[in-house]
């Protein structure tokens, strides 16, 4: 089973130490009571991966690991088989010892849109809410972060993260915990909090913004990336049964409305940093994620609309500060 002892020891003497009052019992209960029916299969794949330590590791321009001399073709094939047992791979890409994991999302493109607008991450302790496979955690480490903590209740993503970590030499600067934001105490201990691709899945978006705020230190920075619609500060889309085939989409505000929400929740220095239409080059079906993707979620005759007739996905990045 996945052990979290390294993380507990890591935070024991720092600002996250109060978390130890609740976290170990919480994760022990998760291991006993909440494991997915496929978890053992997924974790078995992780255990059968080789423990590799790269001679070249690039987390600045991507997530890339190489070894000299290179691993054998047989080792690479065995590694690929174990990683394919963890499909679908949604967030990436990863390049590992000559094997490229071509994920559904080009998460590196999102990072390129976000990075120019945020405060330097060097030396910072960071929380990434809804972190998926942990791709962006590694990019945060590549920018010099002291510690990057991701939370995501999806257990496949936890196994994907642990697989990548094992192939990166067991790097302890990034960690993923199988939790939702609502399961965290009000730590007020992170220098930066990222919430990317989460807000529209929340039934109560303002509660989510308060939860994010409660994790930040004073003067800490929130990086919020989410779906938006065009319009003024009063414009909010509340989809019906589905949006782009997703059932769990509740509120899609305009960027000005989202700015107003953040200000209502007490954030300051709120700015709309970026807006970008999601394309079928950024989100698409691949050999590592073979089910339907964005192309199937858009109107086949008019890609400016979803199949339900709503505006096609438009994503905004907002930056805000906790006073």
UniProtKB/Swiss-Prot annotation:
List ligand-binding residues for carboxy-S-adenosyl-L-methionine.
91, 105, 110, 130, 181-182, 196, 200, 315
What does the record give as EC number? Answer: 2.5.1.-
Q: Which UniProt keywords apply?
A: Transferase, tRNA processing
| Top-rank EC class of the record's enzyme | transferase
Q: Which Gene3D superfamilies match?
A: Vaccinia Virus protein VP39
Q: Name one GO molecular function term.
A: methyltransferase activity
- Highest taxon above the source species: Bacteria
Please provide the Gene Ontology terms (biological process) for this protein: tRNA wobble uridine modification
Which Pfam families does this one have? Methyltransf_9 (PF08003)
> What reactions does this protein catalyze?
carboxy-S-adenosyl-L-methionine + 5-hydroxyuridine(34) in tRNA = 5-carboxymethoxyuridine(34) in tRNA + S-adenosyl-L-homocysteine + H(+)
InterPro entries, alphabetically? CmoB, Mo5U34_MeTrfas-like, SAM-dependent_MTases_sf
The family database entries (PANTHER family) matched by this protein are listed as: METHYLTRANSFERASE, TRNA U34 CARBOXYMETHYLTRANSFERASE
Subunit organization: Homotetramer.
* Function description: Catalyzes carboxymethyl transfer from carboxy-S-adenosyl-L-methionine (Cx-SAM) to 5-hydroxyuridine (ho5U) to form 5-carboxymethoxyuridine (cmo5U) at position 34 in tRNAs.
**What family is this?**
Belongs to the class I-like SAM-binding methyltransferase superfamily. CmoB family.
Name this protein carries in UniProt? tRNA U34 carboxymethyltransferase
What taxonomic lineage is listed for the species of origin?
A: Bacteria, Pseudomonadati, Pseudomonadota, Gammaproteobacteria, Enterobacterales
């Amino acid at each position: 089973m996945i052990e979290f002892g390294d993380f507990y020891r890591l935070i024991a003497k720092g600002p996250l130490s109060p978390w130890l009052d609740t976290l170990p019992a919480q994760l022990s209960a998760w291991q006993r009571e909440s494991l997915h029916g496929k978890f053992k299969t997924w974790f078995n794949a992780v255990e059968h991966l080789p423990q590799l330590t790269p001679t070249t590791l690039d987390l600045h321009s991507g997530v890339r690991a190489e070894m000299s001399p290179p691993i054998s073709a047989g080792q690479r094939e065995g590694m690929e088989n174990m990683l394919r047992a963890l499909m679908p791979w949604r967030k990436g890409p990863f390049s590992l010892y000559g094997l490229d994991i071509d994920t559904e999302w080009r998460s590196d493109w999102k990072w390129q849109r976000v990075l120019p607008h945020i405060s330097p991450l060097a030396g910072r302790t960071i929380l990434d809410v809804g972190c998926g496979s942990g791709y962006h955690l590694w990019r945060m480490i590549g920018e010099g972060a002291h510690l990057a903590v991701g939370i995501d209740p999806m257990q496949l993503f936890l196994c994907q993260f642990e697989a990548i970590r094992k192939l990166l030499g067991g790097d302890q600067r990034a960690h993923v915990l199988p939790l939702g934001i609502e399961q965290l105490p009000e730590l007020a201990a992170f220098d930066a909090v990222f919430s990317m691709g989460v807000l529209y899945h929340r039934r109560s978006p303002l509660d989510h913004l308060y939860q994010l705020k409660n994790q930040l230190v004073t003067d800490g920075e929130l990086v919020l990336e989410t779906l938006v619609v065009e319009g003024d500060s009063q414009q909010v889309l509340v989809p019906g049964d589905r949006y782009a085939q997703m059932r769990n989409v509740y509120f899609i505000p305009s960027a000005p409305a989202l700015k107003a929400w953040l200000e209502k929740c007490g954030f300051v220095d709120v700015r709309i940093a970026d807006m970008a239409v999601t394309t079928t080059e950024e989100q698409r079906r691949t050999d590592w994620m073979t089910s339907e993707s964005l192309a199937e979620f858009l109107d086949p005759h008019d890609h400016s609309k979803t199949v339900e007739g709503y505006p096609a996905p438009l994503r905004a990045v907002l930056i805000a500060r906790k006073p």
